[in-house]
Amino acid sequence: NLPNSQKTLSAFCDKSIPFCQMVLHGSIQYTGDPINLYHDEGVQLLNMIEYGYTPYYKLTASGSMQLKYTENNEIFSSKYSLWKKSIANAYKISQMLSSVQGETMSSHESDGIHSVVVYGNGAKLYVNYSSSEWTVDEKNVSAGGFLFVDSNGTKTEKWGSEK
């Protein structure tokens, strides 16, 4: 799995560029951090969408308390039955973006709150991490959501409680 480029900022950098993701997207499938082990599932789903990750979860059949005294004690939320609905939703979102899975990322622009990704086939992805609606290119992107415009101009949107 590739690191989330948002985490790689240092005191010497004021902007993050998802270099690895831009180079690899369209060539191989890759994952990011496990969605179920991130402090905010909605943000991690938006990261997955923005950076082109394949959904990734670390799961167990029983609760994570059974891992407390093992080498896997960092796994704090892993019971499959609790994540089943979220997993189905993440794969549904991934399927929505399947038309760009084999495409390169031509450009990636981000101010840390809003991101625009353009793919080799001309499709565009708008990601809004803000708690307010975002208007860009005469399009509205819901708070905490994304808008995908495929190469034919067809829009697909997911947001808020539907994530």
Which stretches of residues belong to each language-model region?
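Active-site-proximal substrate-binding groove within the catalytic cores of carbohydrate-active enzymes
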Residues: N1-K163
